[in-house]
From Swiss-Prot:
Transmembrane domains' residue ranges: 34-54, 77-97, 120-140, 147-167, 247-267, 362-382, 416-434, 441-458
GO cellular component, one term: fungal-type vacuole
Protein's organism: Yarrowia lipolytica (strain CLIB 122 / E 150) (Yeast)
Name used for this protein in its record: Protein transport protein SEC61 subunit alpha
Keyword Protein transport tagged: yes
Keywords carried by this UniProt record: Endoplasmic reticulum, Membrane, Protein transport, Translocation, Transmembrane, Transmembrane helix, Transport
Side of membrane Lumenal, spans: 55-76, 141-146, 268-361, 435-440
UniProt KW Endoplasmic reticulum keyword: yes
Length: 471
């Protein structure tokens, strides 16, 4: 790679890529809230607009496992969700962290080229992904659709992906709060939880027509049943529909994550160049935030997708069956693994199922905790947040750890950061497992990603003085 500047290859494309100009002055917090709301509204509208030209299908969704974490909605303009942005960002984070590409983030020109390269790669990924979706028959047999409709579908998907990329850039450049990726994922999850709690629609699961929303059903049962005790028991324990026990579990997981967000180790630091009061460098328990569970979910989802596709093509192959055997569940069109490696990577659907197969439950718990800890400890090395990277930042900013020699900063940070990263990753995994086993209204991964994102917005508001930071 010596002498080769990968980023320079991107320069010719710069004039042709749409870009959000950075604000010339600081954007007021109220305006940031407004732009964030506008961005969110556009995302929600796009999630409800169906793709023009598709043949509706009730077949099992091979991408079912990825939709939640990628803010994707099947058959809509948000079919690709944030997949191109996330994939491009992680690839370039890996390339930059491992120094496979030469980039100096201290130089404005390099930062701009790096961002342009990410955007270009995201557009290329969206084009490739859209083409694969159409040609593999996700929206109907290509021969039946015709060349014109196939091209139109690809155009819609790529254009929608470009809009999402620009919405994310709008927030990242300082017009809004946080990032589009976190906002869209959290919104998708919160929308799912809200619907399961308050849905006014009625369904029949063999017990007569019932309200789908847990709270709506609870109120309805209290007002229509003479035996209030039985009404409450039914509202908390009803099967195949959201119930109040799941809602209470969801609230408890939310509270636990928010509580654990406050756990941190404060390292006292001071300037090595001038006298002054001590500051602190906080190392949070969730040092890598929700990234470990996001990566674990991505790994699991991709294995599920590959396993399901292979099983459909080669259902009798021994190696394919070892990876996973798939079958439907009663009352559901979606396929689920019933044996093989994929089966042990899938969380039990409830506590009853977990107790019925304790071997699977133990393997699943060990898998999630172990993978989250490894991902968390590994990510700090390639994301610029390792002890060596932080010690380098201290040196550049003229900071030293109070009561320690300047040269011992790395040793002190190495003692704390990797432990916090690994333990924090395992804790995130444990919360996710608890949520899955106790049967919350969303997956453990989804709830954790939503809470950490919402808490991040709370911290932004506290920093601006809009809420009490001590809450």
């Amino acid at each position: 790679m010596a002498g080769v500047r990968f980023l320079d290859l991107v320069k010719p494309f710069t004039p042709f890529l749409p870009e959000v100009q950075a604000p010339e002055r600081k954007v007021p917090f109220n305006q940031k809230i407004m732009w964030t709301a506008v961005t969110l509204m556009i995302f929600l509208v796009m999630s409800e607009i169906p793709l023009y030209g598709i043949n509706s299908s009730d077949k099992s969704d091979a991408l079912y496992w990825l939709r939640m974490m990628l803010a994707s909605n099947r058959g809509s303009l948000m079919e690709l969700g944030i997949t191109p942005i996330v994939s491009s960002g992680m690839v370039f984070q890996l390339l930059g962290g491992t120094q496979l590409i030469e980039v100096n983030m201290d130089l404005k020109s390099d930062r701009e080229l790096y961002q342009t390269a990410q955007k270009l790669f995201a557009i290329i990924l969206s084009l490739g992904q859209a083409t694969v979706y159409v040609l593999t028959g996700m929206y109907g047999p290509p021969k039946d659709l015709g060349v014109g409709v196939c091209l139109l579908l690809i155009f819609q998907l790529v254009l929608a992906a470009l809009v999402v990329i620009l919405l994310d850039e709008l927030l990242q450049k300082g017009y809004g709060l946080g990032s589009g990726i976190s906002l869209f994922i959290a919104t998708n999850i919160c929308e799912q939880i809200f619907w399961k709690a308050f849905a006014p629609t009625t369904v029949n699961k063999g017990r007569g027509y019932e309200f789908e929303g847990a709270i709506v059903a609870f109120v309805h049962l209290l007002f229509t049943r003479k035996d209030k005790k039985r009404a409450i028991i039914e509202a908390f324990t009803r099967q195949d529909l959201p119930n109040m026990s799941q809602l209470v579990t969801t609230v408890a997981i939310f509270a636990a994550v928010i509580y654990l967000q406050g756990f941190r180790v404060d390292i006292p630091v001071k300037s090595s160049k001038q006298r002054g009061p001590y500051g602190v460098f906080p190392i949070k328990l969730f040092y890598t935030s929700n990234l470990p569970i996001m990566l674990q979910s991505a790994l699991t989802s991709n294995i599920f997708i590959i396993s399901q596709m292979l099983f459909k093509k080669f259902p009798t192959n021994v190696l394919v069956r070892l990876l996973g055997v798939w079958d439907g569940r009663e009352g559901m069109q979606q396929l689920f693994p019933v044996s093989g490696i994929a089966y042990y990577m899938q969380p039990p659907f409830n506590a009853k199922e977990a107790l019925a197969d304790p071997v699977k439950t133990v393997i699943y718990i060990a898998f999630v905790l172990g993978v989250c800890a490894v991902f968390s400890a590994t990510w700090i090395e390639i994301s610029g947040s390792s002890p060596r990277d932080v010690a380098k930042q201290f040196k550049e900013q003229g900071l030293v750890i109070a009561g320690r020699r300047e040269t011992s900063a790395y040793k002190e940070l190495k003692r704390i950061i990797p432990t916090a990263a690994a333990f924090g990753g395992a804790t995130i995994g444990a919360l996710s497992v608890a949520s899955d086993l106790l049967g919350a209204l969303s997956s453990g991964t989804g709830i954790l990603m939503a809470v950490t994102t919402i808490y991040g917005y709370y911290e932004m508001a506290a920093k601006e003085g809009y809420v009490d930071a001590a809450i």
